[in-house]
Structure formats: C-alpha cells, structure tokens
C-alpha cells in the first residue's frame, strides 16, 4: 500500500520514482490505522452516530492515537511509525546516557539489504513506571533519520530529548511528576 495525498503538479513524478525504485521510500506513518472504525475510542460519540451535530465530546483523555492502541492492546492494521522500504536495516543501541537535564540515545543503523540503498527512521519511546498517575504504555520521545545508506553501510544517529519531556502535570498536587 502506498498512501499518496494531494501531491501537487509534480506528485505523479515523485510516485513514479518510488514505484520504479529511483527513490527509495523511508517515511513512517504519523498516525495509527485501525482495523475497524469501531476500534477508535471516540467512534461511538461522533456526531453522525449520536445525533448531536453541534458538539463533539472526546472521551479519549490521554489515550489519543497510538497511546490508546498500545495501552489497551487493540491491534491496529498499521501502527504509528510503520513504514516500508525496498531494503532492510539492522538497528543496534550503542549508548544511552541520562542526567537531570536530558536523555541521549545513540543508535547504529546498518543497511543489511543487498541491492538497494535506503534511509531509516529510528524512533525512541519511553515508558513510565506504574504509579498513581494514569499514563499510556509508551510515548514517543524522539526520532532521527539516517543518511542514505548503501548496502552494508552504517550510520550512527543520536536522539536527544529533555528529561522533563517525560514528566506529567498532577493537578491534585499542582506539580510536575516524573
């Protein structure tokens, strides 16, 4: 499946380049595709279902998109961050450092295919420990794309994010909690 949106007057050329392997796809989905419309948590309350055409009330809370599917074990058709290429990659975590200000993840990516060059997107997620605050199973912390890698070639990417990005606001205590 290749999703092609409103590409403009040069879009056909770009699609042809991907289909003929002149350009190798490396994009990732920015949302989750459910197997069924009913798998989306707000599907029952959309106005065309409940008759309220003036207002929409979402009950998703913090569980929007992939956070809902991951946390409640709903198997999507295509996951957030899913993407295909004409080649394959091996991803190895080389180093992780963390202090009170930031987390840094260093990853080595190798094109293990034997025919096509390609780029890969490395995604870093974190999970909060169980606690009194409601939290999704995992959240995206950051991502990075490699340079164009020939078969057998390696690249090291570094994803850095603020430690405070993992905090949540606790309204009861009026404080940021990790």
What is each stretch, according to the model?
Residues 1-119, 125, 151-153, 177-178:
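Secreted, periplasmic, or luminal enzymes acting at the cell surface/secretory milieu
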Residues 109-113, 128-130, 163-165:
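Beta-strand elements of well-folded, non-transmembrane domains
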Residues 132-173:
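Intrinsically disordered, low-complexity Pro/Gly/Ser/Thr-rich segments with frequent PxxP/GP/PP motifs
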């Amino acid at each position: 499946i290749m999703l092609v949106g409103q590409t403009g007057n040069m879009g056909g050329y770009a699609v042809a380049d991907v289909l003929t392997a002149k350009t190798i796809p490396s994009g990732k989905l920015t949302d989750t595709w459910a197997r069924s419309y009913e798998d989306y948590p707000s599907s029952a309350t959309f106005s065309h279902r409940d008759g309220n055409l003036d207002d929409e009330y979402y009950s998703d809370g913090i569980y929007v998109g992939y956070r809902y599917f991951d946390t409640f074990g709903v198997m999507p058709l295509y996951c957030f961050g899913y993407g295909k290429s004409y080649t394959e990659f091996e991803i190895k975590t080389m180093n992780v450092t963390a202090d009170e200000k930031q987390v840094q993840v260093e990853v080595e990516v190798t094109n293990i295919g034997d025919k096509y060059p390609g780029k890969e997107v490395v995604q870093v997620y974190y999970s909060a420990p169980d606690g009194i605050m409601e939290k999704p199973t995992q959240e995206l912390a950051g991502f990075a794309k490699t340079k164009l890698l020939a078969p057998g070639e390696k690249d090291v990417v570094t994803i850095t994010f603020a430690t405070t990005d993992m905090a949540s606001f606790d309204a009861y205590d009026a404080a940021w909690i990790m």
